[in-house]
């Protein structure tokens, strides 16, 4: 369960997971408020959510393996839930690596 934006954020997190690159912010969402067959527009992860996942011993890999990014982000509080916006411009993606 999850959509392209949630999956993208989870895949990026998985790439950074073992590298220790935890000072980052990644956000991806659909401007129409929808991402796949879910009630979320996308997902985001930052340092706080990274720590939440680590504390709860949630690794992104098992969720990626079954394409269930929604449950991962629902568990750590990283879903972007805007509701339908009726404005479909494009997907918005932001990635910041903090110094």
Annotate each predicted stretch with a short phrase:
Residues 2, 9-99:
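Internal helix-turn-beta structural module
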